[in-house]
Amino acid sequence: MNTHNQSSNQNGGGSGGGGGGGGSSTFSPIVLTSTYRLDVQEKYTFSYEIGSGTYGMVYKADDKKRPNNKVAVKKFRSTKEGEGLSLTAYREIGLLKELSNENIVKLLDVCLNPKDKLLYLIFDYAEFDLFGIIKYHRENGSHFSDATIKSLIWQVLNGIHYLHSNWVIHRDLKPSNILVMGEGKECGTVKIGDFGLARIFQSPLKPLNENGVVVTIWYRSPELLLGSKHYTRAVDIWAIGCIFAELITTKPLFPGKEKDPKIPSLFQDDQVEKIIRVLGKPTLDMWPDIKHLPEWKRLSSMEAFPNSLAKCVGIDENSQAYDLLSKMILYDPSKRITASEALDHPYFKELPLPLPNAFSKPIPYPPRLPINKKKREFDD
């Protein structure tokens, strides 16, 4: 695919991010010098809140030095007295300051505000995310064009290939973390965001489960659900496969009901059942290493179902789209397709070809609204 070969080729080299090809697990130290310790409101004019999470809030704002240039400002909640910079914020800054790819969100600025002692990260503003775009189609009873689906998924894979080539696992891929740029020179360009759960991995791999449960449950891979202690880049590929299917149908592929998320040790039986109802029950022939997972014996009490993926997604089993999707959501993570292999899949070589601008003209989607459709001022 001619429009993207250059970016795909550069991803294997590791231009700075993620510790490089040697598998190092550290970044250069983060030093918040006096240049960062400026009143954030002196540099940016805040409009309204556009998102929130356990980390804090995200605001739409204008850069005072660059008129009409929109930015997104991520405001971290205060930590307990004396704790200083949160570990989540530290990790996100450490990763993003060294990663550079057209499909990864760009960190523009860091401010440690002297007034409220809070940390602010400033990014390029993305008008859309896949959560909102999918919701628009679902509520309107419409579907994405084949070209848009292919362009979006290619760009997500391109960004993840870059991360994986630089020893980074995102660990929280879901539609709301896949941003898409609006009008401008990068219109229709995917930007993978929210690196609060991203981690460096090493080769040979070390256990990563000590960081707790990751990945929103609908996009959580079976090895995580069954208690794997040594998960890999394949968890990101599973999540992308779930997003791929959701773009095709505008509905989540595995919408399980989560038990108390505050108790990470809970076995999420409803989520596992949702997967089994679509892919069938995994067997030892299908996934030999499943017998080593802490929760695998729980599967014996679950009902068996035939594989109904093609029917659930509504695509031909003989199509290249189905072939790619089925390889992204294989039970066995060691057999799951890699990001590099996926980018080279025949699906992306048949018409329509993926494009840098995933949107048709004019863009049909409404602009991002304030939370609760009410203006949320910065000082609220």
UniProtKB/Swiss-Prot annotation:
Biased composition (Low complexity): 1-10
Location of this chain's protein in the cell: Nucleus
Name this protein carries in UniProt: Probable cyclin-dependent kinase 8
Top EC class of this enzyme: transferase
Record field: compositional bias (Gly residues): 11-22
Subunit structure and binding partners: Component of the Mediator complex.
InterPro entries: CDK, Kinase-like_dom_sf, Prot_kinase_dom, Protein_kinase_ATP_BS, Ser/Thr_kinase_AS
Known cofactor(s): Mg(2+)
One GO location term (cellular component): mediator complex
Reactions the enzyme catalyzes: L-seryl-[protein] + ATP = O-phospho-L-seryl-[protein] + ADP + H(+); L-threonyl-[protein] + ATP = O-phospho-L-threonyl-[protein] + ADP + H(+); [DNA-directed RNA polymerase] + ATP = phospho-[DNA-directed RNA polymerase] + ADP + H(+)
Domain of life assignment: Eukaryota
Disruption phenotype: Cells exhibit slow growth, they do not aggregate upon starvation and form small plaques on bacterial lawns.
Organism (species): Dictyostelium discoideum
Function (record text): Component of the Mediator complex, a coactivator involved in regulated gene transcription of nearly all RNA polymerase II-dependent genes. Mediator functions as a bridge to convey information from gene-specific regulatory proteins to the basal RNA polymerase II transcription machinery. Mediator is recruited to promoters by direct interactions with regulatory proteins and serves as a scaffold for the assembly of a functional pre-initiation complex with RNA polymerase II and the general transcription factors.
Biological processes annotated in GO: aggregation involved in sorocarp development; G1/S transition of mitotic cell cycle; positive regulation of gene expression; protein phosphorylation; protein stabilization; regulation of aggregation involved in sorocarp development; sorocarp spore cell differentiation
Protein family (similarity comment): Belongs to the protein kinase superfamily. CMGC Ser/Thr protein kinase family. CDC2/CDKX subfamily.
SMART domains, A to Z: S_TKc (SM00220)
Main subcellular location of this protein, as a coarse class: nucleus
Domain Protein kinase intervals: 44-348
Span list, region Disordered: 1-22
